Amino acid sequence: HVRSRRQRQMCIRDSLQLGQYGEQDVRHDPTRAAADPRYAEHVRDVDAETPARFNADPSRLFEASGSAGKLCLFAVRLDTFPKEASTVFYIGSNDPADLTTVRRHLLTALPRLPIAGEYIHRTAYDIGERYGKDTFLLIDRFGTARVPAAFALKSRVDAFFERLGLRGVSDRVIQAVMNRLPSHLPARMREWRDRFEHHLLVRVSVDTAPATREFLSAFFDGRASGAFFECDADEGRKAFLHRFAIAGAAIRYREAHPNTVGDIVALDVALRRNDREWVEQLPADLEDGIIHKLYYGHFFCHVFHQDYIVRKGVDPLQMEHAMWTLLDVRRAEYPAEHNVGHLYVAKPSLAGFYRQLDPTNTFNPGIGHTSRERGWEDCCADSAKGWPQGYRENAG
């Protein structure tokens, strides 16, 4: 049985390497979903006491989905969509409740879901504007196709200097150049940065833009705490590109300030769909160990990326564990988008899923603090009960 399975795998591998496959080999079966077909309904349930999505959600663990290195994957099924004409609205507020109201309305009242809704806190905006500038300019001028080559070149340069005992040379040189350049962001974005602490980028299809515009106009009419503007094409593109550049800005900050920064604690967190207190409040003892906190994320899903730039001399692992405790109190799920890796403890349902996929524990043993022993010993057996119920229902 094992030999025949290996032979099938080698046959698949050889066919892929030789390009010996075609359209006739792809099964267009509607029950073979690339994503959860119920998610649109799920995310609209803004009063639910559970997160909209997180990596270890038992109802969405299936084959490659959530496999975390426990399978040898030759191909995966992905959804594709025609590119829609869209409009971007840029919202700013000093009251988080404003954005909560916007989120709840747009998710429940629009005939179609928004295409995207990205949150940026002012601190993340500032760090991204300065320390993500080179990423922004690279993509803005040359497109995403050049990014892999640029990062490969940077890695080679860093490797050369690290052999000489010098770390982060390219980051510091690039940052010195970027610091001499003027702001690359549109004027209205910079104005909103000065006026408002919380920023929300909303992209909607053109057929829902009138309803969105009407709601935002009525909601912010006479409201001192917030305002919005409708982006032109260039502003909308640059707003979302800025959001993308923020994701790597904390790492650049660390490399540019080696004398003051110890490390970065990076969390991705799924909050409850009905959580109105989504702005994190840290105790003073944790605040004292942090230089900057970067909050940004997928606001309509209530999934946030939280990057903490930790002071030199502070134990980042101890800080992270303390933050886990706070997230547990808030009934959040984490990691939201990343796998547990060898840092987080896999919950029983996830550990059982790993055992289903890899009964011999050959691939990536020990992930999620599970057993490293062949055959799993006594780990995870009780929770390995077959595919999650949700997907058995979908399969019909």
Descriptions of predicted regions:
Residues 10-11, 118-119, 123, 130-131:
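Active-site loops and adjacent core secondary-structure elements that bind or stabilize anionic groups
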